[in-house]
């Protein structure tokens, strides 16, 4: 039998490879245009993203009960099998088949959400529990630091390859690849990701589960109800904690608008006139900036007040939304890419600040479920934003019907995005202002004061 140290080393290695393979998707740099090029409308694309977010929310809580009933390793392996099914659906997806294409995408998004929910937390728990108790926290911090480096590097490589092979112009310039059709190039990133899915499955089998399964005879339904009850109890605790309420509401607003851009990003680059082969270069640049941002925000937590830090994030998001709304196409479209930088800075900063401040205001008995609750509500908010984006697009399509009539599908998609983006900075600004007014009227103080009040018993000297 392996020693505890050997099991810990094996699980750490499996965890690093599992996360890298599971999250490195060759189609991310061309995510939006992939769906649109398969023949979907923008409204259908928005609906599918809403369904994906909803499936994560619905399956997240039952997945905890499944982990307790079946074992964490089995849940991680199941999530890897779901990834294989998810990618097979994409690989054999018919192009432009109308309702059939949408139906297969719908199943794909539900399976993808289930896979995300099943491995969420279970893979981390397999590693954390296997690390010897002495020095566990320090060892876990080192594991997360290694994971960040691995993921940043692989994300850059995968983004560059995925965008390049999707571009018909790029592929046809390569020796031995001339004459490839657009349809063939569209499927290359998907076949590459199918290979990643099988590699993910192989790695998932390497985990060793050191956590004993529940010996209770409770049914899966009873365990699921208990999980939902625990989440509702956490929600009630959050409502009694003003600082936690404000932090989560702020996170929901900021995260949903940032993810809205991340979702439609590849269509924005197409609108600027940038070839798909450069999308990977853009995302790789974003990943590099994200690494540098992590070093800066760590210092900002100790220098600036919480309200100033999150106010800075709001300013970044507004600047990004305002910039993309103007669709500046100078320098062959690259001037417009400059306004994407605020989103990269905002995303990395936001989640670091939220993690720091929520940990500060949450007691140890609620900390884990508060962070889980934050993740669930963020996915729910993202789903709602995508629903409203779909409704906005449908309304714009109806209102500009005569203007859109002579345009082809790609030109129509670009025009609708152009019209929609002009609204976003002002909607975000209005919602942010309403949030500030609500906090001031409801709690009679700002975020910094609420955090200081909440953390006062354990941070009296600060």
Which role fits each region the language model picked out?
Residues 1-5, 130-131, 440-462:
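Intrinsic disorder in cytosolic terminal tails and internal cytosolic loops
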Residues 1-9, 207-249, 457-462:
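Juxtamembrane intracellular "pre-TM" segments in multi-pass secondary transporters
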Residues 14-33, 48-67, 74, 79, ...:
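Substrate-agnostic recognition of the 12-TM MFS/MFS-like secondary transporter fold
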Residues 72-78, 189, 306-313:
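Juxtamembrane helix-start motifs in multi-pass secondary transporters
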Residues 81-99, 105, 315-331:
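C-terminal ends and interior cores of transmembrane alpha-helices
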Residues 166-195, 393-433:
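A membrane-interface helix-boundary motif in multi-pass transporters
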Residues 171, 182-186, 193-220, 439-453:
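Helix-loop junctions on the cytosolic side of multi-pass membrane transporters
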Residues 308-354:
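C-terminal transmembrane helical hairpin of 12-TM major facilitator-type secondary transporters
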